[in-house]
Design a protein with these regions (language model features):
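Glycoside hydrolase catalytic-domain context in secreted enzymes
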Residues: 1-388, 406-838, 842-852, 868-913, ...
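Extracellular acidic, Ser/Thr/Pro-rich low-complexity tracts
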Residues: 302, 859-861
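Short beta-strand elements
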Residues: 388-408
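N-terminal beta1-alpha1-beta2 submodule of the flavodoxin-like/Rossmannoid cofactor-binding fold
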Residues: 856
């Protein structure tokens, strides 16, 4: 069966999603949508340089193009753009080019702005009917935002633009091309007529923004976060960014759960809020209850003058009981179809009370380590945001109900206090009270020893292949008895980055990563960074999709699922089995640099959006690796900062989205985090990965570490080579090693097996998890030649050659017949290693054979920086190598080139990220022997 990856349809769908996720916060006097023939002046350099995404691994998609707002407005033709002002900007940009930074995590949060004087604003106003001011921000992996000018706050230059433009123009629209929410106090200062968050909409973001501005799409986005008056109003700000210990003292009171319970007056724009160009009237049609399931029916009527969509949100207020609860919890949401003026739709929303059960981590209810519904009234509210929701009915429980019995797991070991509400008199908001957090009472070491598998068998090679398990001729357990201890150990190692065993430029290969494993018919699976598109560091292009925050703001999981069907097709086309995403960490604080990758401050919205992505990709036999499990809520010192969290907050907030993705989305690949939670680095946390994930949730997939993660034994510091706890915890794969067979990371798994800290049965258990993933993968189908679906392409603008410029020829070299071991210098005088640049050497080979291209280089960046170099011969990729930041130390990397024919060749280097200092580069002749063993050319 053939399926078609239609890139025009892909672009149209991504554009629609980006428009649907745009959030209109203000629209005075109906200034939007723009009207036909209006004259518009556009201010702010981001009008030309649209941020498609944030930075780091989640943003490194080589997009074939990125649309911007100004060109898209002119392409649309609805309005007349002030071309005099546009020309001034374009001339200024020639001397003030976009600053891409000096490498990994060195990109600036914002870009320098062209000064806008009172006179310039006045002149533009004389030629225009209204103004659009475009402001841009970015942040990302290894780089949090800051409560400073140019990041969370406006710069002085931006303040000047807004002040002068708003004074000169009667109508001003502000467009925010940002990954995170930002400080919004300037709205009160300057009073622009309209404010529109367009987030980071991928490569179609510019066109999508214009669709909203011109009314082709009525903005239906709703905030997936609460925008407070000030950054200090978020309770997590006090502890956010601590380099050593981050105490989650706000506990379960994150986002609107905090503000609606304790600080209603600190909210500028509430969770779930977003305006439309039309008006809707909502009417409750009743609340029906069957058991613990409540059904809300809400009639929505478009009483305005434009077609549009509305989102209905259901919140529940649970009785305070003995545990204390937030005054609102999102229980369900639904979005209408496109309603024409006068049209109506009845939405049926179902809310399961058991999903709102509270976890008793102290035993105060008499049911320690249980999820409970305490006795009392459960009040249902329905509205279009959390603040406007009105009561529609109540469900009364006469007595406490135990919903689920769990096991104490991952409780903190350090004492601290957490927030809980205290209500006094008739107040509709709580007073902050504090209580001691329950600490761990179980013996974790004893639990691990008691539960570890010990029975295993080694029978040697019986001639069975993994295909025999696939065809149900033998069991997986039988198959694994053939594998030696060394085979099982090698299987715990993923190879990368940019392993030549899988799709070029991708993050890792795993499964059959050694010759020995491949002899048993174990395929090599491939994963690639995401979540907003496929990252291929060799320069291969892929579609850049709207980012996580924008997707959540659509409140439309069906639309997101449809988009990720297309992503699934693209993954399959590129022979990639898993996208490293969605990212589903909670927006605990607006300053987290990777919030753009994640969805929301709410775990229910987060989980349902993640499930939608997984379902979409799953329709084409591929999947996503949900990440980062768990509490990856700051980037600063993310390798070592200890997240200290109550067990209740973990289960109700920070793990809940993952639980939904597993149970509703069918997740079968998960990535753990870099840092520790309650003293244990998550990559080796038994209670997280076995007790909760596998035993309680019934998870049957794989778990991989984040790239070059640390692991520890309790009470010890983290180490990249300490893999014994990793295997024991069922974190199945360490990501990544350069070579699995040689144990290039020098991990201690074999040592642990020899001294009894590990058993062969534990290794077999992890191998079984990996094989279960492989058995359902397209990699297995490809290996067996049974791939049923074939991908064809339509309208493809995507190149499989290197991205970036084609590169200037830096040197032309005639290579004399070299002797074995002879080194031939390549000149570096004109070489640029900036991100996206290409450099070409014209080489005339006079001797066939094997050569090594050797780089001697350094980087001032830290060890988590990822700096890829791709090498092409005559536009054919030879290999991509990735070095990590070396903190100034000189290192050596090499690429093997097999020259089978003499004559002239063009060797191109493509640098995927800035930050490399090249000290020396040369070709070394190795010889003619074994040339056929190399896959190059």
């Amino acid at each position: 069966m053939k399926y078609t990856l239609d890139y025009e349809k892909y672009a149209e769908l991504a554009r629609r999603v980006a428009a649907e996720g745009s959030v209109l916060l203000r629209n005075e006097d109906g200034v939007l949508p723009l009207q036909k023939g209006q004259r518009v002046s556009i201010f702010g350099r981001t009008q030309f340089e649209h941020y498609k995404s944030g930075t780091g691994s989640g943003g490194m998609v080589n997009a074939p193009y990125v649309t911007n707002i100004t060109d898209s407005l002119k392409e649309d033709g609805t309005v007349q753009v002030n071309e005099v002002l546009e020309a001034q900007y374009r001339e200024w940009l020639k001397d003030h080019p976009f600053d891409i930074g000096e490498g990994w995590a060195m990109e600036p949060w914002n870009q320098e702005e062209m000064p806008v004087s009172e006179e310039l604003a006045r002149q533009a106003a004389e030629q225009s009917d209204l103004a659009i001011v475009v402001l841009g921000r970015t942040a990302g992996e290894d780089k949090d935002n800051s409560a400073a000018e140019g990041s969370y706050l406006l710069t002085a230059a931006e303040e000047e633009i807004l002040r002068n433009v708003c004074n000169a123009f009667a109508r001003t629209i502000v467009v925010l091309n940002v990954g995170n929410i930002m400080d919004m106090k300037w709205v009160d200062r300057y009073q622009p007529q309209a404010v529109l968050y367009v987030w980071q909409g991928g490569q179609e973001g510019g066109r999508a923004t214009v669709d909203v501005l011109t009314g082709k799409v009525n903005p239906g986005g709703k905030l997936s976060d609460t925008i407070a008056e000030d950054i200090e109003d978020y309770p997590s700000t006090e502890n956010f960014g601590d380099p050593v210990e981050n105490f989650y003292t706000e506990d379960i009171y994150v986002g609107y759960r905090y503000f609606e319970t304790f600080a209603r007056d600190k909210v500028k724009y509430p969770f779930g809020f977003g305006l439309s160009y039309t008006r809707f009237q909502t009417e409750s049609m009743g609340l029906a209850v069957q058991g613990t399931e409540a059904t809300v029916i809400e009639k929505v009527t478009n009483v305005g003058g434009m077609s549009g969509r509305e989102t209905i949100q259901v919140y529940v207020e649970a009785p305070q009981g003995k545990l204390g609860k937030p005054l609102r919890q999102l229980a369900a949401y639904a979005k209408t179809e496109e309603l024409k003026p006068g049209a109506s739709e009845e939405l049926i929303l179902k809310a399961e009370l058991t999903e709102l059960a509270s976890y008793d981590d102290s035993g105060v209810t008499g049911h320690k380590s249980c999820y409970v519904l305490e006795a009392g009234d459960y009040i249902f509210y329905v509205g279009t945001d959390v603040r406007s929701a009105r009561e529609v009915g109540r469900v009364t429980l006469a007595e406490l109900q135990v919903v689920r019995t769990a096991t104490e797991a991952l409780a903190p070991v350090q004492a601290f206090k957490r927030l809980r509400p205290f209500f006094f008199g008739e107040n509709d908001h709580a007073i902050a009270n504090w209580e001691d957090v329950p600490l761990r009472t179980i013996d974790l070491t004893e639990r691990i020893l008691r539960e570890r598998p010990t029975q295993s068998e080694y029978v040697g090679d019986q001639g069975w292949k993994l295909a025999d398990v696939y065809d149900k001729k033998i069991t997986l357990e039988q198959f694994l008895t053939q594998l030696s201890d060394e085979d099982l150990i090698c299987m715990t190692r993923g190879e990368g980055m940019c392993s030549p065993k899988v799709t070029p430029g991708t993050a890792a290969a795993f499964g059959g990563v050694t010759d020995g494993l491949q002899q048993f018919g174990i395929p090599v699976a491939c994963c690639s960074d995401g979540p907003s598109g496929i990252r291929m560091d060799c320069g291969t292009m892929a579609y850049a999709l709207p980012n996580g925050t924008l997707l959540a703001c659509t409140f439309d999981p069906e639309l997101v699922e449809e988009l990720y069907e297309m992503e699934g097709m693209e993954l399959r086309k590129n022979k990639i089995d898993s996208l490293l995403g969605p990212g589903i960490n909670i927006h605990r604080n607006p300053l987290n640099g990777r919030n753009f990758e994640y969805f929301s401050e709410d775990p229910y919205l987060t989980g349902t959006m993640a499930a939608a992505q997984l379902k979409g990709m799953g329709k084409y036999g591929v999947t996503g690796t949900i990440k980062h499990f768990a509490c990856n809520n700051q980037e600063f010192k993310r390798h070592d900062a200890n997240a200290i969290v109550s067990e209740r907050a973990l289960r109700e907030i920070y793990l809940k989205g993952f639980e939904i993705a597993v149970k509703q989305g069918g997740a079968y690949s998960i990535m753990s985090t870099y840092g520790p939670v309650n003293g244990l680095w998550t990559a080796g946390s038994y209670d997280l990965l076995t007790t909760i994930l596998r035993k309680e949730w019934g998870y049957q997939g794989i778990v991989m570490t984040d790239w070059w993660a640390k692991i520890n034994e309790e009470g010890e510091s983290g180490s990249k080579s300490q893999t014994v706890p990793m295997v024991r915890a069922q974190n199945d794969i360490y990501m990544v090693t350069a070579d699995a067979a040689s144990n290039s990371n020098k991990d201690n798994t074999a040592e642990g097996l020899a001294d009894g800290r590990l058993t062969r049965a534990q290794l077999m258990r992890n191998a079984a998890n990996i094989c279960c993933f492989l058995l359902r993968s397209v990699a297995m189908e490809r290996l067996l030649g049974r791939e049923e679906e074939e991908c064809t392409e339509l309208h493809s603008p995507v190149s499989t050659e290197g991205a970036g410029d084609s590169g200037q020829v830096l040197a032309r070299l005639e290579l004399p017949e070299p002797k074995t071991g002879e080194e031939i210098e390549l000149p570096l005088e004109k070489l640029s290693t900036k991100k996206g640049t290409g450099a070409v050497y014209q080489l005339r080979f006079t001797k066939i054979g094997r050569y090594e291209l050797v780089f001697r280089m350094s980087s001032t960046l830290g060890p988590l920086a990822q700096l890829p170099i791709s090498v092409f011969l005559n536009n054919t990729l030879q290999q991509t190598v990735t070095i990590n930041g070396t903190e100034g130390k000189v290192v050596e990397q090499s690429v093997t080139l097999a020259i089978r024919q003499d004559g002239e060749k063009y060797m191109k280097l493509y640098f995927g990220e800035s930050g490399i200092d090249m000290h020396r580069m040369f070709l070394r002749y190795v010889g003619k022997n074994d040339i056929e063993s190399f896959r190059n050319e």
